[in-house]
Amino acid sequence: MSDVFQIYLAGGMQDLSFEEQNNWRERVCRSIITRHRMLNPRIKEVNVINPVDYYNFQDALHDTEKEVMRFDTNFVRNSDLVVVNANDPKSIGTSMEIAIAYEHHIPVLILNTKNKSLHSWWIEMSDKIFDDEEKLCTYIADFYITMNHTSVRSWVQMQ
C-alpha cells in the first residue's frame, strides 16, 4: 500500500481547446490540494495527475499516439481514484480510462456540470456523479482523503 493517494483526472481532450482541456483540471487539482493542506497535512500525501501536464495537442511532445495511450492508461491503473469530467461524453479515450479503472476496482467519480447525456455504461461504471465541482472536491476530501464522512452525511441531508 502506497503512502500517496493518487487521483487521475480524466476527460475529453481531442476536440477541445487547451483551456477546455486544462482549466477544470487545474481548478480541481488546486481545490483538492488546498483541502488536503487545510485538513491535515500529516495524513496520507495526495498526488493529482493532470495528463495535460504531460501530453496535449498544443505542445506535441510525443512521437506516437500509442505512447500517449500507454502513458495515460498506466497512470489510470496506478491511481486510487479516477475523476472524470463529462465535458466530452463521446470521447473514446475517456471511455477507455473509465473501463480500465472499473476493471481494476478503482473508484470513478464523474463531474457532469452541464448535465450532458451520459452513456449507460459510464453511469454504471461510476461510483458517484456530481453536477458541481465544489461538491465533488468536498466529497473527495471527506470520503477518500480524510475518511471523515460527517460532512458527506450533512451534505446528503441538505439535498
Language-model segments: what does each one mean?
Residues 1-159:
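Conserved catalytic or regulatory cores that recognize and/or transform ribose-phosphate-containing ligands
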